[in-house]
């Protein structure tokens, strides 16, 4: 596995990607020459997990969702072989015991003195903004006794938006901030308020590095809202297409057109999504402590906003 990783990075895939995308790095001097560390990055695109390890001289391991390792057919087997070959670890995101297993997998990487990549948001941003971090990254940093390197991926969402299989040829950037030391909280990894405070500090640094707008709600909650809006719109369109259902509405609109001002057009799915900007952290509610231990940080507790 280790040999395959270095062959891909330095001989096969790495040189081709560097030639095509001409990636740039800012803050390379902050990368530790030795010892374990967590690289906590924003998450804009699938290609983040390719370009970040490519631009870091040392080997980096990411905790990848288990779906990548269980696909069927030629494509599924090829995907699983690739992720195993580059040293990625499968993670079950269902929470509970699965979250605990993910935490232990990450800690094993750190205790070997290696670099571990984590996306505190837990999923890709649905709209390019930075979302509230999950506290698993904080717990892993405290239990592993390691520093956290804030990382901002630049332009990967434009090169490979969600749903696009082949990335657009354009320059990709990686910004690596100064290491964050949380040793002052040693022994407090079970304090949910400490975990929230650490996570918010990490997200604040990511906001400064990336220049992204910060939204104090979970990215998964935003995705749920966008999906719900899309389903509602689809139902409305389906109902409007039924025979006879639109006729009476049209007659009413024509009758009222002389007396009433023009009606506002229906809200599109994109409009509905754009309207969801308010602070909704309270709606997420405190998560249970078991879920807080997942590799993507599948837990949280109510706490300070990252920008506070």
Write out the residue ranges for each language-model feature:
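Alpha-helical membrane-targeting segments
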Residues: 1-20, 72-87, 165-171
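Non-catalytic C-terminal accessory region of glycerolipid acyltransferases
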Residues: 4, 100-308
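A generic local structural motif
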Residues: 11, 23-28, 47-49, 76, ...
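Catalytic core of membrane glycerolipid acyltransferases/transacylases, capturing the structured
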Residues: 18, 31-96
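Short gly/ser/thr-rich secondary-structure transition/capping motifs
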Residues: 18-25, 98-100, 156-158
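Generic structural signal for secondary-structure transition and capping sites
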Residues: 21, 36, 88, 115, ...
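Secondary-structure boundary/capping positions in well-ordered alpha/beta enzyme cores
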Residues: 23, 58-59, 89, 113, ...
